[in-house]
Amino acid sequence: MKALYPGSFDPLTFGHLDLIQRGSDLFGEVLIAVLENPSKKATFSCKRRIEQIENATKDIPGCRTIAFKGLTVDCARENNADLILRGLRAMSDFEYELQVAHTNRSLNNQYETIFLATETHHSFLSSSVVKEVARFGGEIRHMVPEFIAKDLMKLNTN
């Protein structure tokens, strides 16, 4: 089975990587779809985020990374995905993700959204938290892969 894992991944965190690994174990194939959203100012370009993800997932079998614009269900259909994979950190995530899952089903009822709870030690992680800690010079190497930490440090020293 092929799971579509959509997101901005700006930047990719160890929480994302955990979900990708578990998705690979469960479904065999994970298509990581990096959203190109021109109305949102990204920290890293879509191209750089794809490079970061490809580097971080090179040892996880069945992973592929693409860019996408538009609706998640259209991306799933165009790439022959069987399901949509999403992670949940807290109840607040569930409320939002359930709304998105229902919207996706209303647009194309072929796609189920499968939710995986994050590992407890990753439950505080979000890309926004990582960027905020990095902005103030805090330690982030326990939150993101080393090369992403270096990318963020470069941005914050310029």
UniProtKB/Swiss-Prot annotation:
Enzyme Commission number(s) of this protein: 2.7.7.3
Keyword Cytoplasm: yes
GO terms classed as biological process: coenzyme A biosynthetic process
GO CC terms of this entry: cytoplasm
Assigned keywords, A-Z: ATP-binding, Coenzyme A biosynthesis, Cytoplasm, Magnesium, Nucleotide-binding, Nucleotidyltransferase, Transferase
Catalysed reactions listed for this entry: (R)-4'-phosphopantetheine + ATP + H(+) = 3'-dephospho-CoA + diphosphate
Family annotation (Gene3D superfamilies): HUPs
Localization (cell): Cytoplasm
SUPFAM superfamilies assigned to the protein according to its UniProt record, in alphabetical order: Nucleotidylyl transferase
Binding of substrate, residues: 8, 40, 72, 86
Residues annotated as site: Transition state stabilizer: 16
Residues bound to ATP: 8-9, 16, 87-89, 97, 122-128
Enzyme type, top EC level: transferase
Domain of life of the native organism: Bacteria
Obligatory cofactor(s): Mg(2+)
Keyword field contains Zinc-finger: no
Predominant subcellular localization, coarse grouping: cytoplasm
Listed GO MF terms: ATP binding; pantetheine-phosphate adenylyltransferase activity
Pathway: Cofactor biosynthesis; coenzyme A biosynthesis; CoA from (R)-pantothenate: step 4/5
Pfam families according to UniProt: CTP_transf_like (PF01467)
Family to which this protein belongs: Belongs to the bacterial CoaD family.
Job description of the protein: Reversibly transfers an adenylyl group from ATP to 4'-phosphopantetheine, yielding dephospho-CoA (dPCoA) and pyrophosphate.
Assembly information from the UniProt record: Homohexamer.
Protein name, per record: Phosphopantetheine adenylyltransferase
Organism of this sequence: Prochlorococcus marinus (strain NATL1A)
Lineage: Bacteria, Bacillati, Cyanobacteriota, Cyanophyceae, Synechococcales
